[in-house]
């Protein structure tokens, strides 16, 4: 387990230092460089056969990781996406604009990559580590997830979706996604298909 503290300015570092038994490696950025940078740092330093990202805000339930493990073991999956729209027990209501944007991006992705996902931007994606070379990632912003997913789908052949529970935040609670993030994601989906 790798933990990346991306320049937290609360007591995250103190909590992490007091709980060193919960992870194998800790990497800390002195300043906040964004999720994409944290993901890249994690990928640069990970080992093992599989990778999954767990955001510390707990929008995604870590107990759902057991579902990912079962699918990897039973079907030798190359990658697994958690779907907030096929939820197991609960999902918090989404902003209607975010949901419409996600449906559109998912629809375009499915056409271009010949997949049948329901929720490409849940960002709860587990995959075989050999599908992604961190040195080939060019994006650090929100579109990085689309870059990772498109590269993985082009490199692998067996992808699954599992229902996940979701307790998303709204803007007042710290949600950072905005309408303008839609455009770089769409461009990455389009250009990523033909690179």
Predicted features and spans:
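A conserved acidic beta->alpha catalytic loop
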Residues: 5-14, 58
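Catalytic donor-sugar/metal-binding loop of nucleotide-sugar-dependent glycosyltransferases
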Residues: 115-116, 137-140, 149-167
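Short, conserved SAM-binding/catalytic segment
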Residues: 18-23
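Short beta-strand/loop segment that forms part of the nucleotide-sugar
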Residues: 1-8, 27-29
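Active-site phosphate/pyrophosphate- and oxyanion-stabilizing loops and adjacent acidic/basic residues
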Residues: 14-17, 40, 66, 150
